[in-house]
Amino acid sequence: GWAVPFAQQSAETWRRAFEVNLTAPFVLTQACAEALAKSRCGSVINIGSIYGLVGPDWGLYEGTSLGNPAAYGASKGGLAQLTRWLSTTLAPTVRVNCIVPGGVWRNQDQAFHERYLKKVPLRRMAIEEDFKGAVAYLASDLSAYVTGQELVVDGGFSTW
C-alpha cells in the first residue's frame, strides 16, 4: 500500500516509487543524452518534490486517507542528487536542473487542504499553471548559466 503506516510499507511499493521517480528519469536522460549534447544547448528538467527537501509534517495527514510514504521522499531526494550528478557529467553541452513543486491542488481531503494552506505563506496550493514560468525559464537561454539547481516552486511552504 501507498498511504499506510511505515511498518506496513512494502519493499514492492518502495521499488515501484524508485522506478518511477528515479530510474525512469535516469533511463530517459541516458537515452536522450547524445542528441541533447549534439544540440549544444540541451536542457533536462527533472520534477522533484518538497518532500525531497523536507520531512513530512504528519499533522497535515491526521484523520485523512492521505499519507506520505518513505519511498516518495527518498526517491525525490535521490532525484535531486541525480540532477546534480548529471549536471556535472553532461556539462558543458547539456544543463540539468530540477523543479521542486509544493503541494498541487487535486481535490484533496478538506482537512488536509485547510491545514496545508496554513503552512504556505501564499495561502493556496499550486495549480499546474504555476509551473509554466519555471519550466520556460529552465528550458530557455534565460537560464544558460544555470545547471545542477533545484528551483523550488512551493508558495513558500519550505521557508518555515
What are these regions (language model features)?
Residues 6-9, 17-18, 116:
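A hydrophobic alpha-helix adjacent to the NAD(P)-binding/active-site core of NAD(P)-dependent oxidoreductases
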Residues 1-13, 37, 45-91, 103-104:
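Catalytic loop of short-chain dehydrogenase/reductase
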Residues 56, 63, 136, 147-160:
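Short C-terminal tail/terminal secondary-structure segment
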Residues 46, 95-105, 139, 152-154:
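Conserved SDR Rossmann-fold cofactor-binding beta-strand/turn motif
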Residues 120-131, 142:
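A conserved structural motif in NAD(P)-dependent oxidoreductases
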Residues 41, 91-95, 146-148:
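Short, small/polar-rich loop/turn modules that mediate ligand/substrate recognition or access, typified
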Residues 29-30, 84:
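A short, exposed helix-loop element centered on a Lys and neighboring polar residues
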